[in-house]
């Protein structure tokens, strides 16, 4: 659907003029830019005719070098040459340190825990490094297309969280790009294949890149691309294959695993080259320093099997989440350069029971799909619309009394989406409420991830439970979250755009999903206990408040002692873990105070009507 654009008088483009928009695949290992030209989506080459831009940036004192020449210098200048920066996007310094053995950089902590990399040009954030790659792609596109871009669709892994998506948008802004939309990589691949093949039915998108893995189950119907479920691993990709081969070389050669950064880079380049050659050859000669040996495809298969198995486990979970059977999936689209590895293709084919689709170059398919979507969003496809229904990867919600997570938007909900839910106050006279926004699948706050906190102030003082606060969650088409809270009687309102300073740690999303399955029974029991404990506390406070006001006036001593005994029992049980006992005691205390509540109501009504004539009441 085209974005409406408002221009100054006399400045509107002529109806027949095409707006220049591109699709960008910002990858861990390689990046591409593509555009629709003469009705065909195709990658755009550089001056030397190369389509792929290595996602590598080498910093000199006065300039930044991007692409092939930068990657070639990685071994001799490892501290100033940044590769695989996508793995650092939206992460905190503590998360990055967990990748320390794989990243030969010198890190400094900046504001909001953001990691900075020391280079000869000064400190560089992952956002700045990504911006240099995007800037190179923008310049390539404007040179090739012969004009200024109105915007770009940039692809991200479906499993990128809010922080990682925001970091990507920030990088684009630094690069001078207007982001028309962030598009999930699997959805981009579906766009490319859906239009080219006119495909309908259930499709799996298996996307294994250099540093991330995504699996998505989609339903394609008459131009509608509906994502039924997503899964994946933000720290799984071809880089892991390279490290496995490098580890094999170290073991075979009897070397120390503690290599200097330059030697480490050189070894990884040798490992990557061997992996690529084994795509077509049965065995290759690997040489490093004074050592050389034979690496067979069978040995490579053994080395990478744990990583392939991890990807297949995510596939099975995504299929289960989608509510379909493996046999119903009619085709599997292969995306990402790492899907060229024969063992990967064989394993995926065996799992889904069909030959994977590789008609479109797996390195290009995401950029091509993004270009098609960019062309549509720029308004160049008047008679043709695409409806892309992406989903959120993890549930969103907020904290309620007792440390419970109340889900407002469940995982795998189609975006964009807005959902509202009403909450109330817990204490009499409460005039403010802390809204704690969470992400995750578990029942307790401590097991979920905190996204943001904000306060709603100015709530009119009322008895507990009388105020109505409507909390609205809005997730836009880019997967970014905004939350607002409004007290309905007074209209006071507060809101926040959720921009966490860094993202989930490696594998944390996958772990959160796994935990939600593994601990489902325990979580439900814990939630039930917390709910009864909160209800017990609420009832005890309400009864005590009533006793303080009317106990002496409306109850005799025997009644007061009976209520006090039941309250003591409930206090004792509420500190324990017997959910059923707490629930039963709540009922007993409610029963023993029923007569007291009725007398209070009668007294209130009598006081309200005192001194008024019957005709006044009837009127």
UniProtKB/Swiss-Prot annotation:
Domain of life: Bacteria
The UniProt record lists the keyword Hydrolase: no
Pfam family, any one: HSP70
Disulfide bond residue pairs: none
Single annotated GO MF: ATP hydrolysis activity
Entry's Gene Ontology BP terms: iron-sulfur cluster assembly
CDD domains: ASKHA_NBD_HSP70_HscA (cd10236)
Keywords: ATP-binding, Chaperone, Nucleotide-binding, Stress response
HAMAP family: HscA (MF_00679)
Protein family membership: Belongs to the heat shock protein 70 family.
Role played: Chaperone involved in the maturation of iron-sulfur cluster-containing proteins. Has a low intrinsic ATPase activity which is markedly stimulated by HscB.
NCBIfam families listed in its UniProt record: HscA, PRK05183.1
Name of protein: Chaperone protein HscA homolog
